[in-house]
Amino acid sequence: MKVKEILETMDYGNAPESSEQAMDWIKKHSGEMGLYINGSILIPDGREFFETKNPANGKLLAKICQASSEDIDAAVLAARQAQPHWEGMGGPKRAKYLYALARLIQKHSRLFAVLETLDNGKPIRESRDIDIPLVARHFYYHAGAAQLMEQEMSDQRAIGVAGQVIPWNFPLLMLAWKIAPAIAMGNTVVLKPAEFTSLTALLFAEICLEAGIPNGVLNLITGDGRVGEKLISHEGIDKVAFTGSTAVGRKIREAIAGQGKELTLELGGKSPYLVFDDADLDSAVEGLVDAIWFNQGQVCCAGSRLFVQEGVADTFHRKLMERMNKLRIGDPMDKSVDVGAIVDPKQLESITQIVEDGLKEGGIRYRSPAELPDNGSFYPPTLITEVDPACRLMQEEIFGPVLVGSTFRTPAEAVALANNTRYGLAASVWTENINLALDIAPKLICGVAWINSTNQFDAAAGFGGRRESGFGREGGREGLYAYTRPIHAPSKKLEKVEAHTGSPEPDNQGIDRTSTLFIGGKQTRPDSGYSNPVFSTEGKLIGQVGQGNRKDIRNAVEAATNAQGWGKAFAHLRAQILYYLGENLSARKNEFADRIISMTGCEKKIAQEEVTAAIDRLFTYAAWADKYDGAAHGVPIRGIALAMNEPVGTIGVICPDESPLLGLI
């Protein structure tokens, strides 16, 4: 197209980014990529390879080595042997290495960006302007965290060896999210990148060599899901961090249960995007374009559920459709393209199938009229309205450029619709009323809520989910604690208390007292209709306790879940109640000590010390109740990031036989 024609039509011209240097880097490796283990990039003999292709045209980029069990063992062993020295060198020395990585990422930023786009299919402007700068930011931030660890976190130490598995939607950024805090705190790492997108991780391995990272501190193993499964189950791993689907996260949790490994899961989402009638609609439309069509909607926190207040719904949908008409879809290496390629034909097939099946339940579909390229994996930006809140499209994560919309009447209804999901990763609230925003945001069950914005990420602000979106935080001070454990004096091993047996005949001690269950603020008899005897160390019957069954457990969990007023109560009130419990326990100190003696057979002094410790714990937790403050994070945006503490929810506790009262408190 000539300049004159461009000026007459005002159409976008092509602005292609060169892939020459990235392809030269691949050719330098003869098109075959190895593993990074113990400071060396290698391809062990006899290994299989799998292909990685450019999703925009289906052409082969490179062949990636499939790691074996022996390779995983070697990587974990290298990390284990390197960990004591890495932690022992101290935070300031580790900080220099992280700083070097940050500088090298900036020096090679264009190569990283181009390689990321070739491998993943996201537009080059997203890789260049968003992903890579944020990768460097994470290493800069965590270099500072390492520098200050001994002053600011002197009561913490590294966990050990971290096994990390990352997804294909943000390959290098997820690598930085995982590796930077882990090595900053003195851990060593074995990381597995996604099968579809391993190239930037292998380029990162090369800059680790350039930065002089000690052998074994960082290890990269490539392969399919079988490699990840073996890695997280490896007995040499102390900490597992995974970002990916909820289904795989659930399997990981089951696989490592009982192994004593620390775990962070950042899983799927179905994030709500709330637009109130007083919002700046034009800004909200632009924000929505970023929320759902950024990275082709392949974002765990994508604002894929749109809720607009009824009074402005028609206007907002019209503006949104007009904006969709202007979206450019095509070669992600074109700097003027808005929406790139889906990462793989399998993912494209999954998106198509979910949408077609979901539309059978109802809904009106509108697609961007932009012409799709003939080759590659592309899906048009899509809006589906007039769907039921319980339908599949509204409830299931599509992980593609598909937006599902509905309306609401009142703020209370908006909150109810937004929380009507099994996920809880993020949310966006659009309103010009700051009072409304500050009222709505804390009511949303999610890890992150953005006000008049979306997809705001920074290394200084923690990110993570609730419900089936996972647990744990990455980024900020919260993310540092995910890779440390407290330093404390060795605990004394408690002697095991054996169950006492004896005669079921009670002593003649007067009127019988029935020990019932305590559920929902009242004493209730067990649904089972059974009671179990409790004997003293001499074999005498102390009393009968109710034997709970499944229904009792269900009733107890339901009562605890419904007691939401406790979490919403003022911290001062919770503190006063805990103090009051401590006062009442103190008044009956001797009675509780006698019961402990009769049940465990311990000395009177030990029983009294246990009761005293329980009272002390109650007063300590009461003291902390109104002092557990949030934080204001310093993020490099025009705004402020507030970290607000929230209760975990309903907690199930199994008390030990040892120290029965203190264990309960």
Predicted regions and their residues:
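Glycine-rich loop-to-alpha-helix module at the N-terminal edge of alpha/beta enzyme cores
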Residues: K59-M149, G539-Y628
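A structural signal for short, well-ordered beta-strand elements
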Residues: E51, C65, E87-G88, D277, ...
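Conserved C-terminal structural/oligomerization subdomain of aldehyde/semialdehyde dehydrogenase
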Residues: M1, K59-A62, I213, I237, ...
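ALDH superfamily catalytic-core signature
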Residues: A247-D388, L417, I451, E495-G502
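Rossmann-like NAD(P) dinucleotide-binding subdomain of oxidoreductase/dehydrogenase enzymes
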Residues: A146-S283, F408, I597, Y628-I665
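Hydrophobic face of amphipathic alpha-helices that form TPR/SEL1-like repeat modules
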Residues: M1-A56, H142, L148, K492-I542
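Residue-level signal for inorganic ion chemistry
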Residues: G58, R94, E116, G186, ...
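Short loop-to-beta-strand entry elements in the cores of soluble alpha/beta enzymes
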Residues: Y97, A180, A184-F196, T200, ...
